[in-house]
Amino acid sequence: MQLLDSPIFELSPIAMWLEDFSEVQKQFDLWRSEGVEDIASFLLEDKSRILSCAHKIKVLHVNPQTLKQFEAQNFEDLTANLAQIFKADMSSTHLNELVALWNGETLFENTAVNYTLTGHRLDIRLRGTVLPGHEHDLSLVLITTEDITPYANAQRLEEKSRLIAEARFQYSPTSLWVEDFSRVKARLDHLRRLGD
């Protein structure tokens, strides 16, 4: 496989996974033959279908950065413990990937929550691309997982601070208001400069 022969895969600072979605494609073909047209609605009717598709995906290879990111000793350690990595409800994020692939798209992107093998939360940006020549059977899909935990933590902290500030105004036992004194300050600064 040309991608695996390239040092770029092994040396990439981004976690990369090569996965085989061909069993998912076979499931899609079966559902199409049964008359399914709106895959999103069909999957949401019974979310176990999403989980079933997830279990059909085979991890073929990962790069060293993937092992590092998920705190795995080796490929076997990682693949034997995928349930720990994907332990949260991933149906909503996985749904978007399945809909994209069902619609013939060769690129998809999501944010999701994964966990390292030692239990640390990872907020990730997942990007996937069906490699050229494999569009018909989805047998080779390149997935990257970028750790965006610091960014996500900052967003959560900002949201928490905003909610606390709003609550102080809404539930204060005394009257509170906000005034803009910037014009007063500008005038005082102007007078101070004139006095110097």
Identify the role of each PLM range.
Residues 17, 60, 92, 97, 108, 110-122, 125-129, ...:
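PAS-family sensory domains
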Residues 66-78:
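PAS/PAS-like sensory domain cap-loop motif
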Residues 76, 82-113:
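Terminal output helix/cap of sensory domains in signal transduction proteins
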Residues 118-141:
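Short loop/turn elements at sensory-signaling interfaces that couple input to output
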